Amino acid sequence: MGKDEVMESGGAAGEFAAKDYTDPPPAPLIDAAELGSWSLYRAVIAEFIATLLFLYITVATVIGYKHQTDASASGADAACGGVGVLGIAWAFGGMIFILVYCTAGISGGHINPAVTFGLFLARKVSLVRAILYIVAQCLGAICGVGLVKAFQSAYFNRYGGGANTLAAGYSKGTGLAAEIIGTFVLVYTVFSATDPKRNARDSHVPVLAPLPIGFAVFMVHLATIPITGTGINPARSIGAAVIFNNEKAWHNHWIFWVGPFVGAAIAAFYHQYILRAGAIKALGSFRSNA
């Protein structure tokens, strides 16, 4: 008998013991009353600032690395300098860990339209909140990359502005698949780390939730930087594209929106309807009310 059955079933056949956790009620599709709540706007501001900081630190790291490894600027030993791909991956994963930890109690710490979209599909956030979050994240990303350009104007355009592009030798299908799988890993980790069922049984999990999320971002970057520069976050991609505003940045830009949203949708379906058996529970509820 599986662990879930031990915890949730018992006694005579067909009888179920009280669950040791409580699933939050699904968020309404449209909650007009939410628009009059200060907590919503506070959360939107938190998402804006968090995404701004995320893009500033990470894109600055990318530009700095490319400058340090540019032989024409840093000498013959440039190839041995810089933080390397590992350092870039740590910058992205580390900033997500820090910012999710700081904002989780205010906005949920999404910092990514794909995460927001996945949580919306799972009825964790309302449509109104999801739209405002995504707008705030995109604006924050644009401002964050704008700061990088302001502070590193001599190198920003020279080194590509941190924009996501499909690397030479890879097809559009490969790039799209990399973004789908990478975002699936991230959003699946978000669902698992914030699962109320897990939180109820492991009291330390809520405190550590930002850690696996940040580590997932780190691992995905190691795998996909050579392919797409790693998007998995439409705000990150559009922020760099808008400020760099080069034809190369916009070419195949759709990959960095379609891929993350598809990956997030698959992760939401997998976690909610397969792992958490949402479809079976809904069918059981329908039969009991029939």
UniProtKB/Swiss-Prot annotation:
Coiled-coil annotated spans: none
SUPFAM superfamilies xref list: Aquaporin-like
Motif (NPA 1): 112-114
Protein name: Probable aquaporin PIP2-1
Induction section of the entry: Down-regulated by chilling.
Tissue-level expression: Expressed in roots, leaves and anthers.
Biological role stated in the UniProt entry: Aquaporins facilitate the transport of water and small neutral solutes across cell membranes.
Subcellular location: Cell membrane
Gene Ontology MF terms: water channel activity
Motif, NPA 2: chain positions: 233-235
Protein family per UniProt: Belongs to the MIP/aquaporin (TC 1.A.8) family. PIP (TC 1.A.8.11) subfamily.
Notes concerning its domains: Aquaporins contain two tandem repeats each containing three membrane-spanning domains and a pore-forming loop with the signature motif Asn-Pro-Ala (NPA).
Cited InterPro entries: Aquaporin-like, Aquaporin_transptr, MIP, MIP_CS
Keyword terms: Cell membrane, Membrane, Repeat, Transmembrane, Transmembrane helix, Transport
Membrane topology: Multi-pass membrane protein
